[in-house]
Amino acid sequence: MSSDPNFSLTSFLECLNEIEHEFLRDKEENRPIIVRKLRELQQKTPNHVADLAHDSKTIEQIHQTAHRIKVAVKTFIRIDQKFVSLCSEVVHGTSKVMEEFNVVSPAVVCRNLSEDLPAYHMRKHFLLTLDNPYPTQEEKQNLVRLTNESTVRVGSSNPARPPLEVHQLTLWFINARRRSGWSHILKKFAREDRSRMKHLVRAKLSSSNQSTPPSPTSEYPSNNLDDFLSDNLGRPLTPADKQQFEDDWASMISWIKYGVKEKVGDWVYDLCAANKKTPKPGMPRPVTTVTKRQPARKTKPAAKPKSRTANPRASTTPSIDSTLDSSKLESTPELSMCSTADTSFSTFGSSLSMSHYNPFQDGNDILQSPTVKARGNRKVKALPKRAGKQQPDEVDNGKIPFLCLSVAFV
C-alpha cells in the first residue's frame, strides 16, 4: 500500500484488513509493523479524503473493519488491564497470607531456622513494634501459634522441645527489653516514660530513613531527633550524649536482629563469667546486659584457717622424771638407737634418785605387762628388751646396764 502513489478507498480497506488480521494473530514481531501502518494511514488519510470517490459500499466495509479493530483493541486493553490487576491482587493477597501465616520464602528456608526458632517470630515482632514492644494478649497468642507451627514445619533441632506457651513468650519479651538495651534507653533518654520513648523511637527511625508505624498527630511540634533527646535529658544535647545514644541504639538493634548466639561480646562475657565460678545448685546464673558488658570481677576466695593442731613428734631424750605432757608422743624407731640410749644413760647417771631405782621389781614383769607406772602418775609403755635378761644382782650393786629400750609415752 505504501508503494502505491494512488490512494483510494479500496487500498484503505485492504490496509485495514491487514492490520486487523495481524492484530488478531497477536505475534510479538507484528506489533511494530502494525504501529508503522497505522501511522502511515494517519498521515495520508487527511490529505486524500476530499479527493476520494464516494462509494457507499466500500465506505460501509471500512467502517465495519474499523469497528472490529476498535472492539478488538478495547478488548485486548481490558484483558491486559484485568491481567495486571489480577496479578497485583494475587501478589498482595499472597503476601498477606504469607505474612499472616508467616510462611518463609525459599531463600529463607535454606537457612537453618532451628538456630532462630522459637525466637525468630518474636524478634521480628519486636522490630516491627520497636516504639512499643508490649504485645497484647491477642498478639501473644498469634505469635505462639506461628512459632509452634513454624517449629513443626521447619523441623527443630531438638524434637523433644515442648511447644511454646504464652507465659514463656511474655517472659521472653520482658527479658528481651532488658537484655537488648531497650529498657536502658527508656530510662536514660526517655525519663522512663513510654510515651516519650515512643516519640523518640519514631524520630530515630525517621532520621534513619526507615519506615515508622502510623501515629496520630503528635503533641510535639518538632520531629527532630536532637530536639527529642535534649528535651528528654532536660539540658542541651552534647556530642557525647548523641554518641552514647547512637551506640546504645546500634547495640539494641544488633541484639534484636541476631541475638546472643551471633554476637561475640555477649557469649564471650557469659562464658568467662560461667567459668570463673561454679554456681551453686538453685542459684541463678549471672547474665550480662548491654549496659553492663564488663567482665565479672574476680573475687579472692576466702582463705582457709590454718590448722593449729601441732604435729606430734617424739622426744629424743625421754625421761621418766619429766613432768611435761607427752600424752601425744608416740614411739619411733629412732628411740631404740644407741644415741637415744646414751642420752638416757647420762640422764640416769645424773639423777641420784634414779641410781637406786629399779623400774622392774621382777625381770619378768616387762614381758607380762608392758605398761608400768612411772613418777608423776604417768603410764609408760615399755617394749621388751632386745638384750638378754637383766640380772637382779647387777641393779642391787648400783650397776645400771645399757638398755636399748623403746619407750612410748601414753
From Swiss-Prot:
Pfam families: Homeobox_KN (PF05920), Ustilago_mating (PF05722)
UniProt subcellular location: Nucleus
Species the sequence originates in: Mycosarcoma maydis
Name of this chain's protein: Mating-type locus allele B5 protein
Cellular-component GO terms for this entry: nucleus
Cited Gene3D superfamilies: Homeodomain-like
Residue ranges, annotated region (Disordered): 201-241, 275-336, 366-395
Higher taxonomy: Eukaryota, Fungi, Dikarya, Basidiomycota, Ustilaginomycotina
Molecular function terms from GO: DNA binding
